[in-house]
Amino acid sequence: MALKSMVRFLVIILLFLLSLLAIFPTPSHYTWYLTLMVTEFPWIFLAIVIGLTIWTFYAKKCKGASCVMCVISFICFLYPVAGAYGVGHDLKRKFEAAFGTGTTDLQGLHQQTPYAFTRMISGIGDNKIAYTTYPYATYTGVNLTLDFYRAQKPGLQPCIVIAHGGSWKSGNSQELPDIDWYLARQGYNVASINYRLAPEYKSPAPIEDMQAAISYLKSHAAELGVDTNYFVLLGRSAGGHIVLESAYTLHDPCIKGVVDFYGPTDMVWAYRHPDNPLVMHSQKVMEDFFGGSDTQVPQKYADGSPINFVTRQTTPTLMIHGENDAHVNFELSRMLDKKLEENKVPHLLLGLPWATHACEYSLNGPSGQLAKYTIERFVRHVTRR
């Protein structure tokens, strides 16, 4: 019995420590993975805590301390759930304030409510869609490809071009494909691109690759079923930076909107406010991408900052960012939000107080559900024909 009580108490302590990751930014790269689990799969931890609380209630040893830690852990694990309901409650009003009355109630939308606890469990399933890989650009020593998911709807349809994350130096077009499948099922063509990576290829190589991918999709529109008048760019982290920079500098009228998941927007500010080195050596990442520090190649940093290219004609923008992101500071999205507001650009910043980097890893988690709800309406709005 003593051994069983000790094991139970140690498990409760471990859960208590894990629960703190739902409240505070992750302290290291390795705990970041745990933070994703805690914040985007909270129902698992809530169930465990409830079971341990019941077990502890009937135990004779360590009852007081164990019960207190169980209660605190339950509250912490519940934070993403409560936060999602809170954000979702006001989301319709904020979205329509940004993009117009009625834009949340367009016909044919799949997810009718921003968030539901039961959807975290009932939404789990296999929704894969087949893709075809096409080569879209060739440079010396590198052949670039894109994965094309055909819209699950007949006729010419808008195309969403996706840029993966990976600090500009890693990753590929198959990163987190759930959003590709989801959007294709909603009737959009999806092209997830591979682009040239640092440190071998430096800025603005990925922007050039995005332009080449769009050109390829336009020239093969008939066979792919792409409506070339309607492109939306979507990217995560480094990919978020790439799609913002592309949408703001290519000046292509066919790009109707841009969706940025936690992408850096002001590279000088980002360099001068580096991440916790236990999480990521962000200055080294930027030096590899730009070819030096912000003082060594200042023009590269200026030219690589999407915030510097905002005008009144800037593409409508949707930003989604976790406020507990330890990889890309949430302040960077706040800064772009302010600049877009000053220039009266239609935009929305969806801030998620509990969320960390890659928060949409599970589209059924609190962050994933809110992201789906918002993206679906944003894309439908900017591609209305």
Show the residue positions of the predicted features:
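Acidic catalytic loop of the alpha/beta-hydrolase fold
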Residues: 267, 324-328
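Primarily recognizes the serine-hydrolase "nucleophile elbow" in alpha/beta-hydrolase
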Residues: 25, 212-275
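Short amphipathic alpha-helix adjacent to the substrate-entry channel of hydrolases
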Residues: 174-192
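Short beta-strand/loop motif that positions the catalytic acidic residue
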Residues: 313, 319-321, 325
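C-terminal catalytic histidine-bearing segment of alpha/beta-hydrolase fold enzymes
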Residues: 2-5, 21-30, 320, 331-385
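N-terminal cap/lid segment of alpha/beta-hydrolase-fold proteins
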Residues: 20-49, 106-154
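Short beta-strand element of the alpha/beta-hydrolase
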Residues: 156-166
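Hydrolase active-site cap/lid region
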Residues: 97-113, 244-296
